Regions:
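Canonical Radical SAM [4Fe-4S] cluster-binding loop centered on the CxxxCxxC motif
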Residues: 84-85, 89-122
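Long, K/E/R/D-enriched contiguous segments that form extended
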Residues: 258-332
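Radical SAM/AdoMet-radical enzyme domain recognition
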Residues: 124, 128-144, 153-278
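C-terminal accessory region of radical SAM enzymes
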Residues: 294-328, 358-405
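Short, small/polar residue-rich loop motifs at catalytic or cofactor-binding pockets
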Residues: 339-342
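Long, charge-rich, low-complexity alpha-helical segments
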Residues: 8-91
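Detector for the c-type heme attachment site
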Residues: 105-111, 241, 399-400, 413
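Radical SAM enzyme core and accessory elements
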Residues: 1-17, 22, 26-31, 35-46, ...
Length: 472
C-alpha cells in the first residue's frame, strides 16, 4: 500500500488493508472496529486484540507522517513561474542525419522534418559556453550527443569534449557527457573515447534480431542487428562497469517485449536495460492499441518477477523504469516538475536554435531562441515553467502523480494539442511500471537475503541543486 504524499510503502495483510480502507472512508475508530469484527466473525484467527492492534498501528503511522500524510507539495507549485532559469543540461544535436532509416523514428531519418546538417565545432563550442553562462552555481552539467546519429559527426564530438575539459577547472564545472548511438559508426577509436569521456552511453537495440530488423534498417532496407550487436558487446565489455543502457523500442508487433529484454540479457550479456513503448500516430501499423494494454501489463509483471528471481540467483539485471529509491528519492521540486524541459533542459540544433527538448525540434511554434541571443521566447519558457503535476487537473486523483510529475510535455502535446494535457495511454503504462517497481521493493524488504543486499547498497549521492531554491 502506497501513501501518496509521504511516499511510504506498507506491506499489509488483508485485515490491515480493510482497516485502512475504513479509516480512509471516514469511519471513526470504534465504528470501523465494529465493522471489522462483523466481517471477520467467522474467522477465529482474527481476534479483537488483532483488530485493536491494527488501529493502534494506523494511528502511530499517521502520527509519524507515514500514513494519510497531508499534501505538502501543492504550496510549492503555485509560484513556479517565478522559479530560477538555471540551465543544467543540453541535448546537442550534432547530426541531423542518420545512417539508418528506422520506420518508426519520430525524427524522420534524423532530419526532424527539416534539412540535414552537421553541427560545426564553433556552434557546439558556443552551446557549451551558453550552458556554462546560464548554469549559475550548478557544478555538474549534462550534455547528450544526439541526433540523428551523432557518430556521423564524431570529430566534432571529440573536439567539444576536449574544449569542455579545458574550461572545467576555470569555470568550476564538471561536464558529464552521454552518447546516444545506433551503433553503426562504432569503431575501436569510438570505444576508447566513449569509455574515457562519456559518463553514460545509450545503445539502441530493440532486442531479438527479427524484432530489431523489422524497423531498424539502413537506407537500402537491410537490418542492422548483425552489424551493431558485436560492436555493442565490445563497447560494454571495455567500459569496465561504467554506465550504459541498452535502449529498445517495442511496438504492436512485439508486445511480448520481455522476450527481447531476456534475449539481450541471456543471449547477448547485457544487464542494463531499457525498453520504451513506441509513440506513433494513431492508426499506424506499429502503434500500440488499447487491446495491447492487458498484454503489456502482464509483461511488466513477468519482468518484475523474473528480476527478483535473477537477483536471488546472484545475476541481477537493471530495468531503467524499475529504478526507484524509496529512501532517497527525488526532492520536492523534481517530484512536482519532472524533467525540466524548456527551462533547465534544452535541445540545440546543428544551427544553434534552442528547443524545449528533442521532441519539439523542428516545430517553429516551439523555438525558444538560440545559443547566441539566449531564450527570446520568454512567454514559451514561462509556459514550460508551469509544466507540473498540479497544472494538470486530470492528475489530481492519480496515485502515481508524484512519480511522473505530470508526465512528458511532448507526449501531452501530441496526444491532446496542449503541453499541459495528459497522454492517458502513457499514464496507464507508467502506473503499471511504478506498481511493479514498488512490488519489487516490497518483495526485497520481505526476503531476508534480498533485504540484506538492499541495505548494503549505497544511497544516491549525485544530487546537485545549484541555484535551485524551490524546496526552501
Amino acid at each position: 500500500m502506497l501513501d501518496v504524499y509521504s511516499g511510504s510503502v506498507h506491506a499489509v495483510d488483508e485485515l490491515a488493508y480493510a482497516a485502512i480502507a475504513l479509516v480512509d472512508a471516514g469511519h471513526p475508530r470504534a465504528e470501523a472496529a465494529d465493522l471489522l469484527a462483523k466481517k471477520y466473525a467467522d474467522h477465529p484467527e482474527v481476534t479483537a486484540e488483532d483488530i485493536n492492534d491494527c488501529f493502534d498501528d494506523i494511528e502511530e503511522l499517521k502520527a509519524d507522517g507515514k500514513l494519510f500524510a497531508e499534501d505538502i507539495y501543492a504550496d510549492h507549485a503555485f509560484d513556479f513561474k517565478n522559479r530560477s532559469t538555471v540551465v543544467k543540461a543540453l541535448c546537442l544535436h550534432v547530426a541531423h542525419t542518420c545512417n539508418l532509416n528506422c520506420e518508426y523514428c519520430f525524427a524522420a531519418q534524423g532530419k526532424f522534418h527539416g534539412q540535414s546538417g552537421l553541427m560545426s565545432f564553433e556552434t557546439g563550442k558556443r552551446a557549451l559556453d551558453f550552458l556554462v553562462e546560464h548554469s549559475g552555481t550548478r557544478h555538474n552539467l549534462e550534455v547528450d550527443f544526439f541526433g540523428g546519429e551523432p557518430l556521423m559527426n564524431f570529430e566534432v564530438c571529440k573536439q567539444l569534449v576536449a574544449y569542455a575539459r579545458s574550461i572545467e577547472k576555470e569555470k568550476g564545472k564538471n561536464f558529464r557527457f552521454t552518447l546516444t548511438t545506433n551503433g553503426i559508426g562504432i569503431t575501436d577509436e569510438v570505444i576508447e573515447w566513449a569509455n574515457k569521456e562519456c559518463y553514460n552511453v545509450v545503445l539502441s537495440l530493440d532486442g531479438r534480431k527479427e524484432v530489431n530488423d523489422r524497423f531498424r534498417k539502413d537506407i537500402a532496407g537491410r537490418g542492422s542487428y548483425d552489424r551493431i550487436v558485436p560492436k555493442f558487446q565490445q563497447l560494454v565489455k571495455a567500459r569496465g562497469g561504467k554506465g550504459y543502457y541498452m535502449r529498445g523500442t517495442f511496438t504492436h508487433y512485439n508486445t511480448d517485449f520481455t522476450n527481447d529484454l531476456f534475449h539481450m540479457a541471456d543471449d547477448l550479456g547485457f544487464d542494463e536495460l531499457s525498453m520504451e513503448p513506441v509513440v506513433s500516430k494513431a492508426g499506424s501499423p506499429e502503434a500500440l492499441t488499447e487491446a495491447d494494454l492487458p498484454i503489456l501489463f502482464d509483461q511488466y509483471e513477468l519482468l518484475a518477477k523474473d528480476m527478483l528471481r535473477r537477483e536471488k540467483a546472484g545475476h541481477p539485471i537493471t530495468f531503467y523504469h524499475y529504478m526507484i529509491d524509496l529512501a532517497h528519492g527525488p526532492c520536492i521540486y523534481k517530484r512536482i516538475s519532472g524533467c525540466g524541459s524548456g527551462t533547465e533542459y534544452m535541445a540545440v540544433t546543428p544551427w544553434g536554435d534552442l528547443y524545449p527538448c528533442h521532441q519539439f525540434v523542428g516545430d517553429p511554434d516551439y523555438k525558444l531562441g538560440d545559443i547566441w541571443n539566449g531564450v527570446t521566447n520568454t512567454e514559451l519558457r514561462d509556459e514550460f515553467k508551469l509544466c507540473n503535476v498540479y497544472a494538470r487537473p486530470d492528475c489530481k486523483d492519480c496515485w502515481a502523480r508524484l512519480y511522473c510529475a505530470g508526465g512528458c510535455a511532448a507526449n501531452a502535446l501530441h496526444a491532446t494539442g496542449d503541453i499541459h494535457g495528459v497522454y492517458e495511454y502513457g499514464c496507464e503504462v507508467f502506473r503499471k511500471r511504478i506498481e511493479c517497481a514498488l512490488m519489487i521493493k516490497v518483495a526485497e524488504s520481505l526476503d531476508p537475503e534480498l533485504a540484506g543486499r538492499a541495505a548494503t547498497a549505497a544511497p544516491a549521492t549525485d544530487e546537485d541543486c545549484g541555484d535551485c531554491s524551490s524546496c526552501e
